[in-house]
């Protein structure tokens, strides 16, 4: 009955329509994902019967009214979402969705990367892209019995990050560092990467890798179809580490993964515990990886953290920040504050 169906694109700024979408998602046991930039809705006889959204290169919030399931509408909606993403210059697409929608997106050319059985699947619109990416990593492979890996945000890069890298590199024949690639953090990705490259230039046997979509960002991980936070965290950990262990680690020959101890964030502390299971469990058909926790570097009896640096930056307290970060980071933060002051002064001078 597609002839009477109306497909509409809805921006986040359209409050009335967004309220209708939120209600429809709620009726389908979903919620609005805050990262979605634009939705496509399907209405029939002025009633909302389906919707889906685009967040960057990720398809999210797909819901089909139970009354119209089986009509083929889902396939049409998925095609419209893919076309919209392409128009927005996103051609490398992912979807995190309920297990029940896996077959639907297979019909649209998506392939399953990994899954949390019975809960969710992660798919992309290629059957070979992840394998090609893993293959491309092999040129960075180095010989040795102990090959380490660190994954970090460095938001911003601190003396604590540098200490972890130094300690891990000293224990390994080679160390690989991946920087999580997302710009929803306080500092742009390219800035964070530049600080890490400059701040580790003197550390031997280290390769700093640009992040990729296959190093999963917690910031972009969807939670709109999972109600319990503990289940969200579990799914994130399982998805992230299955991809790492099955594809990325074998390409580089990684035998050990290093993390800092986590005294502050309960979620990260639990992630470290769960990481040990997913890196070592024999249920995954990939070589096990040993998790190594390194005690966090302290300053005046307190572990150094990026969150503490961000708190101090909000207070413009560069004096307190100075002993917590490398010189390259301090210089960057000084420039950041100076530009903020100049922008504020310029706004004050601009007539209303």
From Swiss-Prot:
The keyword Nucleotide-binding applies. PANTHER family: [CITRATE [PRO-3S]-LYASE] LIGASE. PROSITE patterns: GNAT. Residues 1-128 form the N-acetyltransferase domain. Its EC number is 6.2.1.22. The keyword Nucleotide-binding applies. This is [Citrate [pro-3S]-lyase] ligase. Induction: Repressed by H-NS. Part of the citCDEFXG operon.
């Amino acid at each position: 009955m597609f002839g009477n169906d109306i497909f509409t694109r809805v921006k986040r700024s359209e409050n009335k329509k967004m309220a209708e979408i939120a209600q429809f998602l709620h009726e389908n046991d979903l919620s609005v994902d805050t990262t979605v930039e634009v939705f496509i809705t399907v209405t029939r006889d002025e009633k909302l019967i389906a919707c889906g959204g685009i967040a960057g290169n990720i398809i999210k919030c797909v819901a089909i009214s139970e009354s119209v399931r089986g009509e083929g509408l889902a396939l049409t909606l998925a095609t419209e979402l893919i076309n919209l993403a392409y128009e927005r210059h996103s051609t490398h697409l992912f979807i995190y969705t309920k297990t029940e929608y896996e077959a639907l997106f297979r019909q649209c050319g998506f392939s399953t990367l990994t899954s949390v059985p019975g809960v969710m699947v992660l798919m992309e619109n290629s059957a070979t892209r992840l394998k090609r990416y893993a293959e491309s990593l092999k040129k960075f492979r180095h010989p040795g019995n102990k090959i380490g890996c660190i994954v970090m945000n460095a938001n911003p890069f601190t003396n604590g990050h540098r200490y972890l890298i130094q300690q891990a590199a000293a224990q390994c024949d080679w160390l690989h560092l991946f920087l999580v690639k997302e710009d929803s953090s306080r500092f742009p990705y390219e800035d964070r990467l530049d600080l890490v490259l400059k701040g580790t230039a003197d550390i031997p046997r280290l390769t700093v890798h640009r992040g990729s979509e296959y190093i999963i960002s917690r910031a972009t991980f969807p939670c709109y179809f999972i109600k319990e936070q503990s289940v969200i965290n579990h799914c994130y950990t399982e998805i992230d580490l299955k991809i790492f262990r099955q594809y990325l680690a074998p390409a580089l020959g990684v035998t050990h993964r290093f993390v800092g101890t986590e005294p502050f964030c309960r979620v990260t502390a639990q992630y470290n515990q769960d990481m040990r299971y997913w890196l070592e469990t024999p249920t995954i058909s990939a070589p096990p990886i040993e998790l190594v926790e390194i005690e966090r570097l302290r300053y005046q009896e307190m572990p150094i953290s990026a969150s503490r640096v961000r708190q101090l930056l909000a207070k413009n307290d560069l004096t307190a920040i100075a002993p917590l970060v490398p010189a390259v980071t301090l210089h960057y933060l000084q420039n950041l504050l100076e530009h903020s002051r100049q922008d504020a002064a310029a706004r004050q001078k601009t007539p209303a």
